[in-house]
């Protein structure tokens, strides 16, 4: 968000971020969201509230196809946990050639130009993209229409990366099975937004990374950067001001 200020972007100083500090929690939430829909938690909770005893089949995420869109630190944490749960993981990223060939958590990595073909094969699409001009509404109506009717969309990246009007349409008309959203284009999300009332939309409120040790994790990252500065060492987590992350 700071890079939206022209004077900040133009300044010669090096900018760093807290990349990696909160990725573990976001990785957990990404897999949790998949399990929420697979295990039909919403139906179970509804029956409990109504004092109804129901028995119904539930799904498994083992053996299912996950596509991670945005394979940076957060996306890799999602993939690592999904792979451990027996999922088959693929990824889409801006620079697929930068993927570590030793990475055993993904079966294949493709570029943005192959996004629609990739989502068409996935049971779960987990978006972990940064907010840039290139990613703005990258998940649009065409991408959502390419997804399976049984698939679920999860967003642990930035709200601006999804066309929310198109997503409301997809959820309302059951073009996809569900969505789990931790981030939104406008925050706080206005109280009259359709997401609040859609039964096939799971929401958390940009707090999937807000763990009890959040500030400690952020401070550890700051201390690391401060030590690098004092010791004259190269900074970790340097932000590319042109790319925006």
Predicted features, each with a name:
Residues 1-2, 93-99:
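Short, polar loop motifs at secondary-structure junctions
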Residues 12, 62-65, 141, 150:
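Phosphate-coordination loops involved in phosphoryl transfer and adenosine-cofactor binding
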Residues 1-45, 59:
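Phosphate/diphosphate ligand-binding glycine-rich loop within oxidoreductases
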Residues 14-29, 43, 185-245:
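C-terminal helix-to-coil terminal segments
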Residues 43-77:
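Glycine-rich NAD(P)-binding loop of Rossmann-like domains
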Residues 79, 83, 171-172:
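Gly/Ala-rich phosphate-binding loop of Rossmann-like dinucleotide-binding domains
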Residues 96-194:
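Rossmann-like adenosine-cofactor binding region
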Residues 65, 84-88:
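Residues at the starts of beta-strands that form the adenosine-phosphate
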């Amino acid at each position: 968000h700071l890079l939206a200020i022209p004077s900040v972007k133009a300044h010669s100083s090096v900018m760093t971020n807290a990349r990696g500090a909160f990725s573990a929690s976001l990785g957990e939430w990404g897999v949790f969201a998949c399990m929420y829909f697979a295990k039909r938690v919403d139906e179970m909770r509804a029956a409990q509230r109504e004092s109804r005893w129901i028995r119904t089949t539930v799904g498994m995420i083992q053996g299912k196809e996950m596509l991670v869109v945005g394979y940076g630190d957060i996306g890799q944490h999602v993939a690592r946990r999904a792979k451990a749960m027996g999922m088959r993981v693929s990824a889409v990223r801006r620079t697929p050639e930068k993927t570590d060939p030793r990475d055993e958590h993904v079966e294949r990595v493709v570029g943005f130009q192959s996004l629609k073909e990739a989502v068409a094969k996935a049971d779960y699409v987990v978006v972990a993209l940064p907010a840039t001009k290139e990613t703005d509404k990258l998940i649009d109506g065409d991408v959502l229409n390419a997804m399976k009717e049984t698939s679920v969309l999860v967003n642990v990246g930035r709200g601006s990366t999804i066309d929310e009007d198109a997503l409301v349409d997809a959820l309302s008309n059951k073009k996809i099975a569900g969505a789990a959203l931790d981030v939104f284009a406008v925050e706080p999300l206005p109280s009259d937004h359709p997401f609040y009332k859609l039964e096939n939309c799971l929401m958390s409120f940009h707090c999937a990374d807000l763990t009890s040790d959040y500030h400690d994790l952020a401070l550890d990252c700051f201390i690391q950067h401060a030590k690098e500065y004092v010791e004259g060492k190269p900074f970790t987590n340097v932000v590319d001001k042109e790319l925006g992350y």
